[in-house]
Amino acid sequence: MKTAMITGITGQDGSYLAKLLVEKGYRVIGIIRSHHSSNLFNLNYLGILDKVTLEECDLCDLAFVIGLIEKISPDELYNLAAQSSVGLSFSHPTSTIQYNITSVLNLLEAIRLVNKPIRFYQASSSEMFGKVQTLPITLSTPMSPLSPYATSKASGYWSVINFRESYDIFASNGILFNHESFLRPKSFFVKKVISESMQIHFGHRDFLNVGNLDVKRDFGYAPLYVEAMWRMLQLDRPHDLIICSGESISLRSIVIHIFKKLGIDESKLRIDHELYRPVEIANIYGDNSSAKELLDWSYDIDFREILDKIIVEEMSSYKSPDEARK
């Protein structure tokens, strides 16, 4: 039986990845910061909380990380832990950069020092590229990070490459573009729009307040993206790959689709310039051809289908704001 170690297991990607690996017969060890602060909703929702083992670990403590990896001796290590909100990174740039960089370096250094054949996956981000001159984004596209979050992810990306080339570690970067599901936190755009639109639908909110809708993003479906993560660590040698849908969709069209699905008039939409980001990228989408070819991975689902899936799940679990606070 293979053993997989997942940092960030309670998040959207970590939970879906844990479910996939449990179904494949892995022993899954999830790394959390603290049992007291962890939100176990996602693991409960997917029915796997009792099928994984949770271990506390401060990823910024190298000695702790080394000891845990020696104890667990994983075959595969997926690093999905990060402060992953672009917006929040502008409010907390120092803590975002410190945590996102130090955690990656400590995991890589621990693997080097433990000196066991551990395969390492690093969750990288399309935000690293910033404002690009040509689309689609490929691995040869120059990086120009425009946020503290993007800066931290770019550093982690190059750290993986450095350790791979310097110490012959099986370490891969999966450069993921936006990917959504019902388990996405409500602080992210798509889930925020669906959640608040649901409140309008049920008469618990008057308007949807959003920032700049005149931007386009490459959105995908989280359960399919975690499958690509797993496939990356099954290759004969490590690769850095772009995991994306290969096309962009405007934020405005997403809002309009959700409103139509829920029968909400567009007059309920309010543009709030206070919600604009300090620096915004107009359009971004990636080239997933290498991932499809190397991983034998297919992605052909329309993002509107994903929105419909999330709406159905959100509808079935909806609670009014008052009920949610209880």
Regions found by a protein language model. Give the residues of each.
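Hydrophobic alpha-helix immediately C-terminal to the catalytic Tyr-X-X-X-Lys motif of short-chain
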Residues: 151, 155-163, 192-196, 254, ...
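Amphipathic alpha-helical recognition patches that constitute DNA-binding helices
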Residues: 12, 16, 147, 184-188, ...
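Generic recognition of short, well-ordered alpha-helical segments
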Residues: 16, 41, 67, 88-91, ...
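C-terminal substrate-binding subdomain of Rossmann-fold SDR/epimerase-dehydratase oxidoreductases
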Residues: 23, 30-31, 190-191, 197-326
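N-terminal Rossmann-like NAD(P)+-binding domain of SDR-like oxidoreductases, especially those catalyzing
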Residues: 1-179, 301, 310, 314
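The catalytic Tyr-centered alpha-helix of NAD(P)H-dependent dehydrogenases
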Residues: 145-152, 182, 186-190, 218-221
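Transmembrane helix irregularities
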Residues: 180-183, 236
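Activation segment
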Residues: 63, 130-132, 183, 253, ...
